[in-house]
C-alpha cells in the first residue's frame, strides 16, 4: 500500500501515469474532446495537488445535495480497508464505471492509487460491461447497472468472468438479488455514505457466506441512538462519531440490518411504518416505477401515499394490496404521476416525492 501521494502513480489500462504525466495530460486535453477520461485527469490533478483535502458532493436522496470537505489521508485509509477485506493486490484489474462527481467513483480511483491496481475505465452508462474484454478482478456498480448487464447475455458472460462485484448506491430488490445468487462472481452489497468515504460494511449476496446482515470492517464500532438509528464510530475515515438517519438493528455478533431511514418513517395513527419496507413488499407486484411517501392527515397524523408512474399496468388491485400489507402500511391515496422523482445518482428523491404528493392533494 502506498500512502505517500508523492510516490503514487496510476496504472491506467496498462500504462503508468505519474503526477507529471497528469499535469501534461490535463493541459493538452479539453472536456469536450476527452469526456470521461478528461474527468479522470482532472480528479487526479486535484488528488496530486498540495491540498490535504478534496470536496465531494452528496447524492441528495433526502434533500438538497451538499458539498463536503474530506481528508485525502482518510480516503486512503478507506481504500486500504476495502482492498484488505477483498484481497485486492497490485496489478489486479478493476473497473471504473461510475461518475467521478460522487464518492463511489472517486474511491475506485483512490483504491487503484493506493494498492497499485490496474484501472480499466468506461464512461458511466447503464451497460458498463458492453465492451469490457479483459477479465476483471473487481468492479463496483449501482443496482441498475447490474440489472441491465444481466439482461444481455454477452454482458452477463463478461460479468461472470469478474472475480468480485460490489453493489451500492441504491436498494437491491428481491428479484435482482435472486438472480445475483446464481452468479459465480463474489457479490457484496455495500453500506456507507459520503460522510464515511464510501462503505464501512459489506453483505455477501451469494455463495455459502450469503447473509441478510451487513458486517462492518474491523476498525468500525456501531451502536444505536435513542431513536434506534445507527451510530458509526469509524476513526480511520471519519473524525467524529456519525449519527445516521438509518433505522437499524444490531446483533450480538456485531452484524446489523437496516430497516429504513428515519426521514422515511411514517407515523400513521400512532404506528410507525417504513416507506422502504412497504416498497420492498410491493416491488415484486409492481410493473411500473413507484414510490411510497406521505402527506399530513388530520385524523392519522400522516397518511401513506403510493406514487405510481402512469402506465397500462400501473394499478395493483386493492384486494392484492390488502393481502400484502398491514392496515397501517396500506396506502390511503394512490396517485398516478408522470415520473417518479429521482436524484442524479438514480435514488428515489424522497423530498420531491413528498412535495409531489402535497401538490397533487392541494390541486385536487
Segment roles from a protein language model:
Residues 39-56, 90-93:
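Conserved pre-ATP/AMP-binding loop-to-beta segment of ANL
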Residues 53-80, 87:
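Conserved AMP-binding A3 loop
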Residues 71-77, 93-148:
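AMP-binding/adenylate-forming
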Residues 152-207:
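Gly/Ser/Thr-rich phosphate-binding loop
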Residues 185-226, 238-239, 364:
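Conserved ATP-binding loop and adjacent catalytic segment of the adenylate-forming AMP-binding
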Residues 221-243, 247-249, 255, 309:
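AMP-binding/adenylate-forming core of the ANL superfamily
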Residues 247-329:
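AMP-binding/adenylate-forming catalytic core of the ANL superfamily
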Residues 305-307, 320-364:
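Conserved C-terminal "lid"/linker of ANL adenylate-forming enzymes
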